[in-house]
């Protein structure tokens, strides 16, 4: 019997090829390029590779062929949009962390190589047309982040964060793999298109495939830190170096949400009646945990961990809705979340490089000494709380409107209530900056690139809250390519 080779078009994988070649080349170069100057050279090349990959991705939008390797690798408009978000959620935290990494003696070459490998795994997750590619992408991303979380080798909290993330992440990967095996056992395929075709036929028993789907969703929920699969997030966010926390707070979530879109919409679209309520339940639990558990936090990184759990819950509402309006709301929310996250962590890193800034009380009187920094932090906190007219309000409004349009009134009402509760801990940060008396001079410098990135993030958070038209239009075209 002749073996039929799948169609192979490596041009569709050019961004992945660029990143993988550069990452492996820099891994070898780091053995020779030692010291601070070598690390600077490696980080510049890594940042350059990210920008090259972004340009290639943008130039490839609208290509006639959208898949290769027999449909296992997909490069459609949705993939391009999510990859651009992935590049931004990698490049921006990397750049704002440069000074922090140098002062903390963490910025050697391997750090940036691991960052590239983690992002490469995310790129494969976004372009997956098969559970095989999806799982390989998840493992590549996860293994790199396990090491990054424990990168501060002399710090017990960092070591604990890396080990805890590794142990729980390994368990989540096992659950995901078992779910994939159940799905394969029923459908006879791991390709999303084949699974979708199978589900459109009339079958008497769906128990096996339903159990498999629940396990797959559970595994992916761990990656986005959705409750009740969130137990790792607060400890890992707090213990990992702040530069790593800034990176892992957004980048893995972008990749995992893209994977959820691929699995739920492309493979299991006909089963929305089954997975829709599961997503709604995860959304409500995540919003509740994020809002209530964050109230008693005094560590700002731990607070932002619970904040991110809550934000994941709001985004999951859009997935639960299961139509174009809901999916568009998810992408709008994720895009805005990237810039809120980069801005907030960029300001935390300014203080961290001077040896403080982990505790909320470290921000006492910041407005009196550095009014510009305090204003930017207030913008990001107000936006995360969903206060108009900022982008965070517009993002939550889109989510709640989609839920109401789908008659998910209970979920929408709970979302509004939990959003109001979570506003208390965002306001606690603002109150500390503006109404408490300063205990230090806050005379730390801020490099030009960090100022530019945090400043532009603040401008976008304000601008998209008032004029969201361009973002909404881009997202609408992206979702049309997925439906």
Curated annotation (Swiss-Prot):
**Alphabetical GO biological process terms:** ATP synthesis coupled electron transport
List keywords of the entry alphabetically.
Cell inner membrane, Cell membrane, Membrane, NAD, Quinone, Translocase, Transmembrane, Transmembrane helix, Transport, Ubiquinone
Q: Show the coiled coil region(s).
A: none
Q: What is one term from the GO cellular component aspect held by the record? A: plasma membrane
Which top-level group of life is the source organism from? Bacteria
Reaction catalysed?
A: a quinone + NADH + 5 H(+)(in) = a quinol + NAD(+) + 4 H(+)(out)
InterPro entries noted in UniProt: NADH-Q_OxRdtase_suN/2, ND/Mrp_TM
Disulphide bridges = none
Q: Membrane-crossing residues?
A: 8-28, 45-65, 78-98, 106-126, 131-151, 166-186, 206-226, 241-261, 275-295, 303-323, 330-350, 373-393, 399-419, 452-472
User: What function is annotated for this protein?
Assistant: NDH-1 shuttles electrons from NADH, via FMN and iron-sulfur (Fe-S) centers, to quinones in the respiratory chain. The immediate electron acceptor for the enzyme in this species is believed to be ubiquinone. Couples the redox reaction to proton translocation (for every two electrons transferred, four hydrogen ions are translocated across the cytoplasmic membrane), and thus conserves the redox energy in a proton gradient.
Q: This chain belongs to which protein, by name?
A: NADH-quinone oxidoreductase subunit N
Species for this entry: Magnetococcus marinus (strain ATCC BAA-1437 / JCM 17883 / MC-1)
Phylogenetic placement of the source organism: Bacteria, Pseudomonadati, Pseudomonadota, Alphaproteobacteria, Magnetococcales
